[in-house]
């Protein structure tokens, strides 16, 4: 990551919108751990689809996603993943400069994932996930809603993420700046 202080100061940034998965922590290995932990669910979902049809499958998937998949993800993040030092440095620098911060994730359980990473959620003015907005990244409409929740002007906002095609496109869609976190 480029020197955070110079990025924030050069562009007179007043707000930062951080992606969570892949940005605040390195998510490599998480997908494999999820498959190993949840392998037993796959035959159940396939059998249920054949037996009950699409309506029941949608209900099962929603329940499974909220009560099995996401809690498993939070547990694995807490056990095997750590915050990126450069992300912690960025958060600290934003706090020092009085820059408003939001965490905007394509997935749910934002507060729970932050807790699993031992990152204090109270440092952020806004915690939001795409499902609660009803729109996934790179939706400019969703990014605009995040800016509204944060009370931030796009030209004074820096989006930080690990995927240019999602996080970067969302930032550009509202006229905000973007900083790519690379492995």
Residue spans of the language-model regions?
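Active-site neighborhood of HAD-like aspartate-dependent phosphohydrolases
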Residues: 1-60
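Acidic, Mg2+-coordinating phosphoryl-transfer loop and its flanking beta/alpha structural elements
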Residues: 156-183
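A generic "structured core" feature
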Residues: 25, 80-84, 115-119, 123, ...
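Substrate-recognition "cap/lid" segment bordering the active-site pocket of phosphatases
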Residues: 104-158, 165-166
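Short, acidic loop-to-helix structural element flanking the phosphoryl-transfer center
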Residues: 3-4, 12, 72-103, 140
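Short, basic/glycine-rich phosphate-binding loops at helix/coil junctions
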Residues: 61-73, 123-126
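Surface-exposed amphipathic alpha-helices with a cationic face
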Residues: 88-96, 147, 168, 172
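Glycine-rich phosphate-binding loop signature in dinucleotide/nucleotide-binding domains
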Residues: 9-11, 97-99, 150-156
């Amino acid at each position: 990551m480029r020197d955070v202080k110079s990025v924030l100061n050069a562009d007179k940034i007043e707000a930062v919108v951080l992606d969570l998965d892949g940005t605040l922590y390195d998510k490599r290995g998480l997908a494999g751990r999820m498959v190993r932990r949840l392998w037993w669910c796959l035959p159940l979902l396939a059998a249920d689809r054949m037996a009950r049809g699409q309506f029941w499958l949608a209900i099962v998937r929603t329940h499974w996603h909220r009560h099995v998949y996401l809690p498993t993800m939070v547990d694995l993040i807490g056990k095997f993943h750590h915050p990126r030092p450069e992300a912690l440095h960025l958060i600290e620098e934003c706090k020092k400069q009085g820059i408003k911060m939001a965490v905007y994730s394509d997935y749910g359980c934002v507060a729970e994932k932050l807790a699993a990473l031992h990152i204090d959620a109270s440092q952020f003015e806004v915690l939001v996930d795409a499902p609660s907005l009803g729109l996934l990244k790179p939706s400019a409409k969703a990014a605009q809603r995040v800016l509204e929740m944060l009370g931030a002007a796009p030209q004074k906002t820096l989006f930080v993420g690990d995927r240019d095609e999602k996080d970067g496109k969302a930032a550009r869609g509202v006229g905000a700046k973007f900083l790519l976190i690379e492995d």
